[in-house]
């Protein structure tokens, strides 16, 4: 909404500052953080009161979790999504369609995760929405968003898969790109969901990825920078940096309460939404493959589950002591802080590797 203050810049030149995406990104970040810091304790108290026993803890998981995490409320994603939404609505350009598409995916996935969390908490079981139903809803949301992105963008770029490290190399998938894009968005959402298993483990890599894609969005949406770096220019996507800023701020606020020992868990409400947001931004700015690099930690977690399930069904043997892979390291004797901080370090290194694709061509 503050974007409209630009109209008053002829009378008040200071309002020209609202033209700059960088300024509004910083404003969205501060707004998201302040919102979560201010309302976080109230949200946590209400969730704890309404949930009673909190998130059910897996009895087949690490036994230490039964002692240290029992009774902790979930659905903390509500804090993040609230701060993210307020920051975005306050600072982003309301006429930019990319903002609304990505925000719709984020909140849509958040609703799916919220209902899943609600089912688990009320029934005190790990069985929330059935897998098929959940995937059907996710693919419907993601498919609609990707259709809009292809229709909105410039052909043939909008329907093409861009290959990093090479100049102007891309595969035009036509309308089949909608299906591919939907897989990227749904895959990202569920990969982040699988990563969210330890205090602070998911939110920091999500923020690292958001910062990276905030930069990529800004550069891809700026014709001068895009030409200099020889990346594909996607008009209008620079505004997505504001969403990334809002996520960074809300994520920092959430980490304050999610730092070990966590006062609240993100839950599917947050992990599905944030993963879906990263996936939809990657599709919008044509950096889907780069997402697999920057979000390599999420890919590793998801692949570990796929490998574990496939191996057990085919051979009756498990590759890992437990999946996702962060539980494997727990079973090997790593402490929770060791796993979390080491995974953060990996996330930083992967982000730097992904950002290197902007220049190495």
From Swiss-Prot:
Cofactor(s) the protein requires to work: Mg(2+)
Catalytic activity: UDP-N-acetyl-alpha-D-muramoyl-L-alanyl-gamma-D-glutamyl-meso-2,6-diaminopimeloyl-D-alanyl-D-alanine + di-trans,octa-cis-undecaprenyl phosphate = di-trans,octa-cis-undecaprenyl diphospho-N-acetyl-alpha-D-muramoyl-L-alanyl-D-glutamyl-meso-2,6-diaminopimeloyl-D-alanyl-D-alanine + UMP
Membrane-spanning segments: 25-45, 72-92, 95-115, 135-155, 169-189, 200-220, 240-260, 264-284, 289-309, 338-358
Gene Ontology MF annotations: metal ion binding; phospho-N-acetylmuramoyl-pentapeptide-transferase activity; UDP-N-acetylmuramoyl-L-alanyl-D-glutamyl-meso-2,6-diaminopimelyl-D-alanyl-D-alanine:undecaprenyl-phosphate transferase activity
Name the record gives this protein: Phospho-N-acetylmuramoyl-pentapeptide-transferase
First-level EC class: transferase
Organism superkingdom: Bacteria
Protein EC: 2.7.8.13
Localization: Cell inner membrane
Pathway: Cell wall biogenesis; peptidoglycan biosynthesis
Entry function: Catalyzes the initial step of the lipid cycle reactions in the biosynthesis of the cell wall peptidoglycan: transfers peptidoglycan precursor phospho-MurNAc-pentapeptide from UDP-MurNAc-pentapeptide onto the lipid carrier undecaprenyl phosphate, yielding undecaprenyl-pyrophosphoryl-MurNAc-pentapeptide, known as lipid I.
GO biological processes: cell division; cell wall organization; peptidoglycan biosynthetic process; regulation of cell shape
Organism annotation: Rhodopseudomonas palustris (strain ATCC BAA-98 / CGA009)
């Amino acid at each position: 909404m503050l974007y409209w203050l630009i109209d008053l810049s002829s009378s008040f030149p200071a309002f020209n500052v609202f033209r700059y995406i960088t300024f509004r990104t910083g404003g969205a970040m501060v707004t998201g953080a302040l919102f979560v810091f201010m309302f976080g304790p109230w949200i946590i108290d209400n969730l704890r009161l309404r949930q009673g026993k909190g998130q059910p803890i897996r009895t087949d998981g690490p036994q230490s979790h039964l002692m240290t995490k029992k009774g902790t409320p979930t659905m903390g994603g509500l804090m993040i999504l609230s701060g993210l939404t307020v920051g975005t609505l306050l600072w982003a350009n309301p006429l930019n369609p990319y903002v609304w598409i990505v925000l719709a995916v984020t909140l849509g996935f958040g609703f799916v995760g919220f209902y899943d969390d609600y089912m688990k908490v009320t029934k005190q079981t790990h069985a929330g929405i059935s897998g098929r139903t959940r995937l059907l809803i996710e693919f419907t949301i993601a498919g609609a968003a990707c259709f809009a992105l292809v229709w909105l963008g410039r052909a043939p770029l909008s329907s093409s898969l861009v290959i990093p490290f090479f100049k102007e190399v891309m595969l035009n998938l036509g309308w089949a790109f909608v299906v591919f894009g939907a897989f990227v968005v749904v895959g990202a959402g569920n990969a982040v969901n699988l990563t969210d298993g330890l205090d602070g483990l998911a939110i920091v890599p999500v923020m690292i990825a958001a910062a990276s894609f905030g930069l990529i969005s800004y550069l891809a949406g700026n014709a001068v920078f895009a030409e200099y770096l020889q990346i594909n220019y996607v008009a209008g996507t620079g505004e997505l940096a504001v969403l990334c800023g809002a996520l960074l701020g809300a994520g920092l606020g959430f980490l304050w309460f999610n730092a070990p020992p966590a006062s609240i868990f993100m839950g599917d409400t947050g992990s599905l939404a944030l993963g879906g947001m990263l996936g939809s931004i990657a599709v919008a700015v044509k950096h889907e493959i780069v997402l697999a690099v920057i979000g390599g930690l999420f890919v590793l977690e998801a692949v570990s589950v796929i490998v574990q399930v496939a191996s057990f069904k085919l051979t009756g043997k498990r590759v890992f002591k437990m999946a996702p892979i962060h539980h494997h390291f727990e079973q090997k004797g790593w402490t929770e802080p060791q796993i979390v901080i080491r995974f953060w370090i990996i996330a930083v290194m992967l982000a730097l590797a992904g950002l290197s694709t902007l220049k190495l061509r």
